[in-house]
């Protein structure tokens, strides 16, 4: 059985790790980096770029370069968070036929799981290159506050990438695993994981207990905001730059997608620089042009200005911390350690706010970019049976329930319940002789069902006629270890049953996923064909070069007919190499043809080289003989025998 890899599928960056024995290994990608930008570019020639190569060309291809797609995964187009992003992203966010938020590149509609699968495929390939064997299983992390649709969509992305997702685990929990197993401290302790990433924010309160030599990680509570992260911090800087430029130059850059892409890069860079410096300069020459000529952007930003721009965003992370502490039934003073995860936590203002709330300095010995992937790899080792000393008890982040009479949300499983869990409850009909009931499943904390997220609905039909309130319908909620919900309804009188895994009226159907898997496999086959074609072209180019060189040196030793045949075959190969539509077979045929007619030329070269070597060997032998004769007397005087051996070369 192959290794189960751990993947942190991030909004901004992704990371892959594996366990080697009890040592964790974060794997470098083909560019030599330990994290890969979660950026996917669709090129004109159907090539798909992932990671750093996609990021490098984003300025010139903004409409077809997709980033922060994780913010859309498992979301409906109408959601206010999606609507907010439509105005900010240089690429198109569109409404799919099922009402989900999809994206568009080169006129092709793409589901977010399909796009995220490209990043997962890159992570899979990174691990395979390192291990030298195929990888088929993975543990993938998600924000703790992801709802059922978002978890299901992440699992779908794994399938499309050719991975069997053994477990979906929460990012803060994964970071706690990485932290807990790295420390030698014994005894029970409570930790807070504050995870502010590129697109999402989570906070989890976790108890690490030592139970008979086994490390038990129990999540006491979790809270967060799945639409708050580093991307929002970047956007504040972008908006500020646009405003300042408009004041100075009278030009609105927000309508210029090329300029926006350059601004995004500059904003991210400025934000990072201001984590260590007090001031930075944004310098973008030729950012745009008007009738008076080109315009250049030059702007200084201080750390104080940045902090003022994002103050409310940092403040927004504190309320979820307060709720998580309350839900866990602990006091702030009970927290032994605070762990920071996610690149945005490097901002001094964020660290300061966290210290202010928790009353202690956050730990600095956890790598905020890699801890989540490390934790996922540890969980992979646990699931493969190679590690027995770790037990993970996670929770469901949001309450789950059904809509009952009057549009009320009746909770079946409360938030922060340890998973896996199962709950059954008996309901009845609202009308006399009601033959069917529709079960609508919701996730959220609002009292009325309409204020929560509708996960899906299904019907239980064939209920025998009876007065209202008489039929006994048992509804069962079952949450698996991935945090994914399975619901069943059963008429206790007839035994009729209807079960669903929540797919909602959104999400991808099995047929769509299968098609995407086929497309991905076809792309892999196409990539292989393109690589083989490139190899043939390279072989052809090399043969053209070597044949031309040989003709220059030895062409005069050939008969006129032989030389003409070679020149004709050479031209034929050059023509086919110039033809961009030529396939591998056509190139290979011309390479073979030139190889055959060049045989005589090769023989002439070989014979010439042999003659040269024989001549050189003969001259060397004669020189050695003369030296031997002339030095004989001296050798005798010195009483040293010098032996010479001539080596004949074939």
Curated annotation (Swiss-Prot):
The keyword Aminoacyl-tRNA synthetase does not apply. GO terms for molecular function: ATP binding; ATP-dependent protein folding chaperone; unfolded protein binding. Keywords: ATP-binding, Chaperone, Nucleotide-binding, Phosphoprotein, Stress response. The modification Phosphothreonine is found at residue 200. Induction: By stress conditions e.g. heat shock. InterPro entries: ATPase_NBD, Chaperone_DnaK, Heat_shock_70_CS, HSP70_C_sf, HSP70_peptide-bd_sf, Hsp_70_fam. SUPFAM superfamilies: Actin-like ATPase domain (SSF53067), Heat shock protein 70kD (HSP70), C-terminal subdomain (SSF100934), Heat shock protein 70kD (HSP70), peptide-binding domain (SSF100920). It comes from the Bacteria. The keyword Transport does not apply. Residues 614-634 are annotated as: Disordered. Belongs to the heat shock protein 70 family. Acts as a chaperone. NCBIfam families: PRK00290.1, PRK05183.1, prok_dnaK. This is Chaperone protein DnaK. The gene is dnaK.
């Amino acid at each position: 059985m192959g290794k189960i890899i751990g993947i942190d599928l991030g909004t901004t960056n992704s990371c892959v790790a594996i366990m080697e024995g009890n040592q964790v290994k974060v794997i470098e990608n083909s560019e030599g980096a330990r994290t890969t930008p979660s950026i996917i570019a669709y090129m004109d020639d159907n090539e798909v770029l992932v990671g750093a190569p996609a990021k490098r060309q984003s300025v010139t291809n903004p409409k077809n370069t997709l980033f922060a797609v994780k913010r859309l995964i498992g979301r409906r187009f109408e959601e206010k968070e999606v609507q907010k992003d439509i105005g900010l992203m240089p690429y198109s966010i569109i409404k799919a036929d099922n009402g989900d938020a999809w994206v568009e590149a080169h006129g092709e509609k793409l589901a977010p799981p399909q796009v995220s699968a490209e990043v997962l495929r890159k992570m899979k390939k990174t691990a395979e290159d390192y291990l030298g064997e195929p990888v088929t299983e993975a543990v993938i992390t998600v924000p703790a506050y992801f709802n059922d649709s978002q978890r299901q969509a992440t699992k779908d992305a794994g399938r499309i990438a050719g991975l069997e997702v053994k477990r979906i685990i929460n990012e803060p929990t994964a970071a706690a695993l990485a932290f807990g197993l790295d420390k030698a401290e014994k005894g029970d302790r409570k930790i807070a994981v504050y995870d502010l990433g590129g697109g999402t924010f989570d906070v989890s309160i976790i108890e690490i207990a030592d139970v008979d030599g086994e490390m038990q990680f129990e999540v006491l509570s979790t809270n967060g905001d799945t639409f708050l992260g580093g991307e929002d911090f970047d956007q504040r800087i972008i908006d500020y730059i646009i405003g300042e430029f408009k004041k100075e130059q009278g030009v609105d850059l927000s309508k210029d997608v090329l300029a926006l892409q350059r601004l995004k890069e500059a904003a991210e860079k400025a934000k990072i620089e201001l984590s260590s410096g007090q001031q930075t300069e944004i310098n973008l020459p030729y950012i745009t042009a008007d009738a008076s000529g080109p315009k250049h952007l030059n702007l200084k930003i201080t750390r104080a200005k940045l902090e003022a721009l994002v103050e409310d965003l940092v403040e927004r992370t504190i309320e979820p911390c307060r709720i998580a502490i309350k839900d866990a039934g602990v006091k702030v003073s009970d927290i032994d350690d605070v762990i920071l995860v996610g690149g945005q936590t490097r901002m001094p203002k964020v660290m300061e706010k966290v210290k202010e709330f928790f009353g202690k300095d956050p730990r600095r010995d956890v790598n905020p970019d890699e801890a989540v992937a490390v934790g996922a790899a540890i969980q992979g080792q646990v699931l493969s049976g190679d590690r027995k000393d770790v037990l993970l008890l996670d929770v469901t982040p949001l309450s789950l329930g059904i809509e009952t009479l009057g549009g009320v949300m009746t909770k079946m499983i409360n938030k922060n319940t340890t998973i896996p869990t199962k709950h059954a409850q008996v309901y009845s009909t609202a009308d006399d002789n009601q033959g069917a009931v529709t079960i609508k499943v919701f996730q959220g904390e609002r009292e009325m069902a309409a204020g929560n997220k509708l996960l899906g609905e299904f019907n239980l039909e064939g209920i025998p006629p009876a007065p209202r309130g008489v039929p006994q319908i048992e509804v069962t909620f079952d949450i698996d270890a991935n945090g994914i919900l399975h619901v069943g309804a059963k008429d206790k009188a007839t035994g009729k049953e209807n079960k669903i895994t929540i797919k909602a009226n959104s999400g991808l159907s099995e047929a769509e996923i299968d098609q995407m898997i086929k497309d991905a496999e076809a792309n892999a086959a196409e990539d292989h064909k393109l690589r083989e074609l490139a190899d043939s072209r390279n072989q052809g180019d090399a043969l053209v070069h070597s044949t031309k060189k040989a003709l220059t040196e030895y062409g005069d030793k050939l008969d006129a007919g032989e030389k003409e045949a070679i020149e004709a075959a050479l031209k034929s190969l050059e023509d086919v190499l110039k033809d961009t539509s030529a396939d591998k077979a056509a190139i290979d045929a011309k390479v073979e043809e030139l190889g055959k007619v060049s045989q005589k030329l090769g023989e002439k070269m070989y014979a010439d080289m042999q003659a040269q070597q024989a001549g050189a060997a003969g001259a060397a032998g004669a020189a050695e003989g003369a030296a031997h004769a002339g030095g004989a007397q001296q050798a005798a005087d010195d009483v040293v025998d010098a032996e010479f051996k001539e080596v004949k070369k074939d």
